Amino acid sequence: GNSVLAPWVRHQFPEVGRIIGELRDTPCGKKECEYCSSEHDPVQELKRYFGHDEFRRDSDGRSRQHDVALAGMRGENVLAVLATGGGKSIGYQLPALNRYHRNGSLTIIVSPLQSLMKDQVDGLIASNVQCAAALSGLLTLPERADVLEKIQMGDIGVLLVSPEQFRNNTFRRALRQRQVGAWIFDEAHCLSKWGNDFRPDYLYASRFISEYHRDQPLAPIGCFTATAKPDVLADIRAHFQDTLGITFKEFIGSHERVNLRFEVVPCQKSEKRQRTQQLLEDNLVTQEGGAVVFVSSRKGAEELSEFLVGKGWACKYFHAGLPP
């Protein structure tokens, strides 16, 4: 396992954690300091972990992605609304990796969907990041046991979990062995009763966080979403103010997607399959590439896939009911 502070050391000698924080987590302010110019510079860390020379810029020329990552590295509570495709995940992944490298702490990322968790872990591994894992129903019992052991041994620095995991006693015990450096809520609109994807267990997570930090300073909280109306944002702010007594540094980006073109084509329900077939022929027959067709139900996905296969298209359906 990696060298991380044992729980008894943190509880018996709290000054140790404070001293480590002063040494490794607080910039000294000297330009000539090699450590600070590397460990506290988001651009340097972006290059180290993801191989990019600069952060993505918004249509107004700013880089909210950079600003969000910097706030996370500084240990601030962050509420970020960044459009889909705007590099939202780097806003919390980069500080998480930086945090793990600096002090060995664990970042918990709460995510609502198993597929999203798997995609993030696969993406990090593809970037040669080996300290990321997910706890989800896609794991076998031996795989789950392996992840829990790695959490306790300090081998994992970025852990993605569903909110339901906070009710699991084995998981709770494993977390007690580690110092949690930040709690991140991806798809944070799931916290709001005004959101279409409200998940009650998202609200329970903050209760667990309060219990976890009962005898120690509260770790930073981050809330990230691509779609949040004003009433949803108000709900998120109120929830964390009421349960944890915190306020956020906010980064509210534009929802404008200049790289996308939208077209609305009215048609009858009975015409949708033929219309889908026609759109595919119009756009894919003469050029390479693929298409994603969204439907409103699992049955609809399976039936449309069967129809398109019958028309000669290489097509597969995907939904949450598929086995691992």
Give the role of each language-model region.
Residues G1-F13:
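Charged, low-complexity intrinsically disordered regions
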Residues F13, G17, G21-E54, D60-D67, ...:
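Helicase motor core with emphasis on the C-terminal RecA-like subdomain
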Residues S115:
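Conserved Rossmann-like nucleotide-cofactor binding loop
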